[in-house]
Swiss-Prot record:
HAMAP family documented for this protein: SUI1 (MF_00604)
The organism's taxonomic lineage, starting at the top: Archaea, Methanobacteriati, Methanobacteriota, Stenosarchaea group, Methanomicrobia
GO molecular function, one term: translation initiation factor activity
Transmembrane segments: none
Similarity field: Belongs to the SUI1 family.
Gene3D superfamilies attached to this UniProt entry: SUI1-like domain
CDD domains according to UniProt: YciH_like
Keywords: Protein biosynthesis, Translation regulation
Organism from which the protein derives: Methanocorpusculum labreanum (strain ATCC 43576 / DSM 4855 / Z)
Pfam families associated with the record: SUI1 (PF01253)
Biological processes annotated in GO: formation of translation preinitiation complex; regulation of translation; translation reinitiation
This protein's name: Protein translation factor SUI1 homolog
Length: 101
């Protein structure tokens, strides 16, 4: 399989808009939960792992927020309370603010 071609639409990766369309259809929830020893974790949920590269988005968020994090069960977990900054970063990345809770 040629890695330069999108498996969904069959267009070259440079012309593919599958991810842009997927961004408009996502219903994303950003919430903060407490974990062991009172540590806070920001959880970004509602992303479709088949249409959005969660590892790439996680790497972007961790780099911009200067925090640790992981991808678990189709959600992104970031160490610390970053709810407002995550919403701003997601909108700068092309996600609609109306679809982010």
């Amino acid at each position: 399989m040629n890695s330069g071609i999108c498996p969904k639409c069959g267009l070259p990766k440079e012309l593919c808009i599958c991810e842009e369309v997927a961004k408009e259809q996502q219903r994303i929830s950003v919430k903060v939960s407490k974990r062991r020893y009172g540590k806070e974790v920001t959880v970004v949920d509602g992303l479709d792992p088949y249409e959005i590269d969660l590892e790439d988005l996680s790497k972007f968020l961790k780099g911009r927020l200067a925090c640790g994090g992981t991808v678990k069960e189709n959600s992104i977990e970031l160490q610390g309370n970053h709810r407002d900054r995550v919403k701003a970063l997601l909108t700068s990345r092309g996600y609609s603010l109306e679809n982010i809770n």
